[in-house]
Amino acid sequence: MITVSDLEIQFGKRTLFRDVNLKFTPGNCYGVIGANGAGKSTFLRILSGDLEPTRGTVMFGPGERLSVLKQDHFAYDECTVLDTVLQGHSSLWKVMQEKNAIYMKEDFSDEDGIRAAELEEQFAGMDGWNAESDAANLLSGLGIKEDLHYSLMKDISGKQKVRVLLAQALFGKPDNLLLDEPTNDLDLETVMWLENYLANYENTVLVVSHDRHFLDSVCTHSVDIDFGKIQLFAGNYSFWYESSQLALRQAQAKNKKAEEKKKELQEFISRFSANVAKSKQTTSRKKMLEKLNVEEILPSTRKYPGIIFTPEREVGDRILDVRNLSKSIEGQTLFRDVEFTVEKGDKIAFLSRDPRAMTALLEILAGNEKPDTGSFTWGVTITNAYLPLDNSAYFQTDMTLVEWLGQYSADTSETFLRGFLGKMLFSGEDIYKRVKVLSGGEKMRCMIAKMMLTNANVLLLDS
């Protein structure tokens, strides 16, 4: 259980949230939601103890264990995969290390024997005999094959490290579990495994995710960070969204009614204030006006980009023909003899246990890679726009944002580009930022803006 009391966090003059009083209880999964920059990750860092709040306290149940999904992918480079997972239960890991060190001694003393017996008791009490098999099961569930369990972390891929660190967070079924974007770099099958695992989790979970389908699957409650405060709602993301939109509409309708009444009273008072015969009615309406409240509806931190794809040309009936496509990387076959046809109006999702296969196929269709065998033909009416998985190559430049977008626009005037960037939530001096310093989310908005400017009639989207 986690109890938050009178919590407030400020950065300079900016207050992210204040007066936060919440309780998170076992058996529930809480989805932490809010706009980029609202303070979702900051809130989790405060709960984990990595960041001191400006004011307030965070308390855990007596003797409860907290586990956090680590974000540093290089912290365990010299550890094996299995040992990295075991370190998720720090108390157990310390017992294991001390116990092993004692047994390695050549001059084993009586004191060592007494201490070893104490450690063995602690080890058994923490279910240490099943620790390695439990860790191995988590790794297998998250798609890390058994032959990698004794590899060093520095020798596995970045995407595999993400899964190992997730297994580390889950290991030992901690009383309180904090997960920041746990589905990043996971394939569909692994996401489904994680959904099932968390849906049956008996302890307290808080999760930050931009994946609303994942939040709908696992969350019993929603924790909304907006308007400078944090509110708790029963229900998953979809239930929160419907409830919050209804509450906003009701508040707006109430204010509209109050404004209309206010205007009516003011008009009566102005019209009859000098009329002695109407003095009682005028006084009565003045009192009514004083009591009339129009509640302030604070501006939301949520802002939505204007993403509109306007094709320059309508597509024909035949969009794409793919015949016998095959592709291998370093001797490993990603796909073989792929055939399909895309027709007008189709929306197709590619699924694979190996994300490299999907990326390779889209790279081929976008014209960036060549297949080993086979061919594909786009329809004569088709112009495609491609959103790659890795966009880093597009931003290795000293260009400003407005200069960068100008490369892809027929209209290169700053007025047009500024307006277009404004639709994608870049305003004021933001347009003069160097693109190489943009955040991942900002770069993604730039890539979508680039796609919009192509006026394409077919979209290729990689994750």
Model-predicted segments: where are they?
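Intracellular alpha-helical coupling/juxtamembrane segments of multi-pass membrane proteins
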Residues: S243-E296
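Short, flexible cytosolic linker that couples an ABC transmembrane/permease module to its adjacent nucleotide-binding
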Residues: L298-E314
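Short low-complexity stretches enriched in small and charged residues
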Residues: T25-P26, A277-K280, T301-R302
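ABC ATP-binding cassette signature C-motif
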Residues: M1-N255, F309-S463
